[in-house]
């Protein structure tokens, strides 16, 4: 009788684990790899502000990082929605009234339609020569690039090395506390 009891306990634990796993997958929010890409149209027709997610090449991986697709698509969508709620910025919307948030390769011509480019987890970036050229062109034409999600010194150095290739004549430096940009709208 003792072995039968042990078998029932093991079977019960296995069923509980399987049910918990199935339930967790049912409510899982997909993000990052596996999410459908929202590629931009040939031209942005509604004239509203939009944000584009920068797709770039990576030459290494980090634990819990997904390269360009980190936080995709929810971080960008949230940023756009909050921009429209907290400012007078009119954002680009699709036919259903949802925010247009595009995914763009650095090699796509649509890059130059993006006023605001977001790069996530850029500590894994490893740009191909054409990506270096295109990102340089984008930035020199006045494009705005926001990058985030660095994980340590190695990630920062990886990003800084990439930017030294893209804009060698513009070194990265800390903005001093008395710089005018810190008092443009609010004192920081």
Task: Identify the residue ranges that each predicted region occupies.
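N-terminal signal peptide c-region/cleavage motif recognized by signal peptidases
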Residues: 17-19
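Cleavable N-terminal signal peptides
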Residues: 11-12, 22
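Short alpha-beta junction capping motif
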Residues: 51, 111-156
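Bacterial N-terminal signal peptides that target proteins for export
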Residues: 1-10
């Amino acid at each position: 009788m003792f072995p039968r009891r042990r078998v029932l306990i093991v079977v019960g634990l296995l069923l509980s684990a399987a049910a918990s796993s199935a339930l967790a997958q049912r409510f899982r929010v997909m993000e990052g790899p596996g999410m459908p890409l929202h590629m931009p149209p040939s031209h942005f027709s509604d004239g509203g502000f939009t944000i584009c997610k920068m797709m770039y090449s990576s030459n290494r991986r980090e634990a819990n990082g997904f390269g360009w697709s980190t936080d995709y698509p929810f971080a960008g969508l949230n940023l756009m929605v909050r921009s429209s709620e907290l400012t007078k910025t009119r954002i680009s919307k699709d036919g259903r009234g949802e925010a247009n948030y595009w995914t763009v390769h650095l090699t796509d011509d649509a890059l130059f339609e993006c006023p605001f480019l977001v790069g996530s987890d850029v500590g894994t970036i490893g740009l191909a020569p054409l990506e270096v050229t295109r990102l340089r062109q984008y930035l020199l034409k006045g494009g705005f690039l926001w990058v985030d999600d660095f994980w340590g010194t190695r990630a920062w150095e990886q990003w800084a090395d990439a930017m030294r290739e893209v804009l060698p004549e513009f070194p990265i430096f800390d903005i001093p506390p008395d710089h005018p940009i810190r008092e443009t709208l609010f004192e920081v």
